[in-house]
Amino acid sequence: MKYINLMLTIILALSLETFHIIDACREIGEVCSKTVFDKCCGNTVCKLRGPFYGECVECLNSGERCWRNSECCSGYCRWFTCQD
């Protein structure tokens, strides 16, 4: 019974820590990975410089890789690239 209580306590502690990590976000200029674990705060976006490695910026410039219109400074993302 003690073993089960110990395991449940450990699982609960790890779960709470995971939720804390997921809720955290990065400010402009900080390192990000464009994942739920390393996301940028607010309306800022992660400008990737390599696989899962980038920096939080206000918006992406023309020619940079994007997923949504809202990520681009121009507001226009076409074929995964910001356009003017």
UniProtKB/Swiss-Prot annotation:
<keyword id="KW-0732">Signal</keyword>
<keyword id="KW-0964">Secreted</keyword>
<feature type="disulfide bond">
    <location>
        <begin position="66"/>
        <end position="77"/>
    </location>
</feature>
<protein>
    <recommendedName>
        <fullName>Uncharacterized protein SJCHGC09800</fullName>
    </recommendedName>
</protein>
<keyword id="KW-0960">Knottin</keyword>
<dbReference type="InterPro" id="IPR021712">
    <property type="entry name" value="UPF0506"/>
</dbReference>
<keyword id="KW-1015">Disulfide bond</keyword>
<feature type="signal peptide">
    <location>
        <begin position="1"/>
        <end position="24"/>
    </location>
</feature>
<dbReference type="GO" id="GO:0005576">
    <property type="term" value="C:extracellular region"/>
</dbReference>
<feature type="disulfide bond">
    <location>
        <begin position="59"/>
        <end position="73"/>
    </location>
</feature>
<dbReference type="Pfam" id="PF11703">
    <property type="entry name" value="UPF0506"/>
</dbReference>
<feature type="disulfide bond">
    <location>
        <begin position="72"/>
        <end position="82"/>
    </location>
</feature>
